[in-house]
Structures are given as structure tokens and as C-alpha cells.
From Swiss-Prot:
Disordered as annotated region, ranges: 32-53
Record-annotated membrane-spanning stretches: 5-25
Compartment(s) where it occurs, according to its Swiss-Prot or TrEMBL record: Host membrane; Virion
Induction statement: Expressed in the late phase of the viral replicative cycle.
Native organism: African swine fever virus (isolate Tick/Malawi/Lil 20-1/1983)
Keyword Transmembrane helix: yes
Similarity-based family: Belongs to the asfivirus CP123L family.
Protein name: Uncharacterized protein CP123L
């Protein structure tokens, strides 16, 4: 039977080998890609917007037949009125405008023109 000192030395060697094996196992596991979290996928691009088709829109609407028939003519007339309003605004007399629009909150003639142009851009 081996002495107690020999058993302690054998036990210490086995313990050291187990600890080394444990550290080796941990380092090998850390290097495996299966242990790492999965990579974040790239963001998906938003779906492309469908181009506006006016004829398709008019088919889906529940407007009266007369309105469906004449809407393009009315839209052209409205565009003409807006463009003539802009041209008229360019040729407008400043003194006459300010006299007719006293109390409407316009600071200057240029202020009124800029507000009107902003309004036309919105609508």
C-alpha cells in the first residue's frame, strides 16, 4: 500500500490535470462560433412605394359619373387659376393691395406675397 504522501501527490497531480482540462475545454468552447450569439441580420429595405396611378384611383373612388368624367378638366382649370393668381400677384400694385387688405395681418407687401406663395406650395 502506498504511503499517504504518495497518495497526496497523485491526488494533487490528478486535480491539476482536471483543472487544466477544464480550462482547455473552456477556451476551446469560447472559440466555437456555435457558442457565440447569432449575428444581427442587416436591416431589410422598406418596400418600394407603388407609383401613383390616377386612373386606378378614379376607378376605385365612388364619385358620381359626371365628376369622374370632368375631374381632369376641373383640375386643369384650377391649375390655370393658381398660375394666373401667381402672375397677378407679381404685377399687383403694392399700395392698392395694402389699401384693400388693411387689418388682415400682413406686415408688408413682401410678407403677403411670401405667405401666398407658401399657401400655393401647400395646396
Amino acid at each position: 500500500m502506498p504511503s499517504t504522501g504518495t497518495l497526496v501527490i497523485i491526488f494533487a497531480i490528478v486535480l491539476i490535470l482536471c483543472i487544466m482540462l477544464l480550462f482547455f475545454y473552456k477556451t476551446v468552447e469560447a472559440g466555437k462560433p456555435s457558442v457565440l450569439p447569432p449575428p444581427i441580420p442587416p436591416p431589410t429595405p422598406p418596400p418600394s412605394k407603388k407609383k401613383y396611378d390616377h386612373n386606378e384611383y378614379m376607378e376605385k373612388t365612388d364619385l358620381e359619373p359626371e365628376v369622374k368624367k370632368n375631374h381632369r378638366k376641373w383640375a386643369n382649370e384650377a391649375e390655370h387659376l393658381i398660375s394666373s393668381s401667381v402672375k397677378g400677384l407679381e404685377n399687383l400694385d403694392e399700395a392698392a393691395f395694402l389699401a384693400n387688405h388693411k387689418g388682415h395681418g400682413f406686415r408688408t407687401f413682401e410678407h403677403a406675397k411670401s405667405l401666398f406663395k407658401e399657401f400655393l406650395k401647400k395646396y
